[in-house]
Amino acid sequence: MSSASSAGRDTRSEILSQPEIWETTLKQLVSGESGDLPDLGSYDYVLFTGCGSTYFLSQWAARHCQQVRQVQAAALPASELLIFPSAWLRPGARGLLVAISRSAETTETLRAVEAFRELTKGDTLAITCNPQGPLAKRARWVLAAPHAQETSVAQTRTFTSMMLLAARLIDGGHAAQAHSALPAAARALLDQYGELAEAVGRDLQLDRFFFLGSGARYGLACEAMLKMKEMSLSQSEAYHFMEIRHGPMSMVDGRAVVLGLMGVEGRNYEARVIADMQTLQARTMGLSPDGAGAAGQISLGAEALPPIWRDPLYLPFLQLVAFHRAVAKGLNPDRPTHLEFVVKLDG
């Protein structure tokens, strides 16, 4: 990968450091440093909440929670829980709120926790990169990765590290397997496809990006969309794979990029969507565990891992595309327009 300008230096470093950061995070999880955690099966329902990136992480986690643990689970922005608590909270049922915040200081998330505790008296668990923050102090349990903390505004390695923390909560039995396979797969992915990410990101003839994901990967497609939008100020959208046919593909043409976060289940359906977008002249790429299923595939590796542990591999390549596009447009991805590291509300 060619050297970047000083603009975006922190973001680039944080993206490329993910193999080492994951190694540290997984070692922590395997060693038992995370301590005792709640039994998700003992709850009537589990809510995952966050804001922005961590809301998308919540979408991903809730889907895996419901599928892996067979527990009723949902994701919602913290503001929805704060403004419409009666639509979501069940005072007569035993619920767990999993609140996710990089900083542990986001006002909406803190207030959502207060509303949950006041109305349900239920348990709360915090997932964060700041174990000393107010969110961590208000939660019964804390899963934290302080070593992953960033200086950049846009979340990259914190997001994927908090994915690993959520995976430990939902499917802790495979943490050791992930520790053995995931960091090496991330290194190989960055080495093999880093130049491709740069080439796609720097191609300013492309002017719109579509990110597609099925199941839990829809939350990751939304996160990739947000990275492209906030870093590079580019038109970017996220959809469930087959939903792009129901209107959005009217925007697909030779200046569009369609990036599919492909899985094993539903692969034939997803491959057909990618093929359809190719006929509309879009540039297409599919990211999949084994590199099979469609033309222009990126092989993530670690295909033996359960999906919840393998899923972080979808993001480094997509983060790099957004980073290089920002730099090519003369922007500073470390400091996206109008954004701050933490959103704090007055009053």
Question: What annotation goes with each model-predicted range?
Answer:
Residues 49, 213-216, 309, 313:
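Alpha-helical transmembrane segments of integral membrane proteins
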Residues 46-48, 100, 209-211, 243, ...:
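Short glycine- and Lys/Arg-enriched binding-loop motifs that mark or flank ligand-binding interfaces
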Residues 41-184, 249, 259-303:
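Glycine-rich phosphate-binding loops that contact phosphosugars or nucleotide phosphates
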Residues 2, 6-11, 139, 257, ...:
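Phosphate-moiety recognition in structured ligand-binding domains
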Residues 7-9, 13-14, 19-42, 141-257, ...:
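Active-site phosphate/pyrophosphate-binding segments
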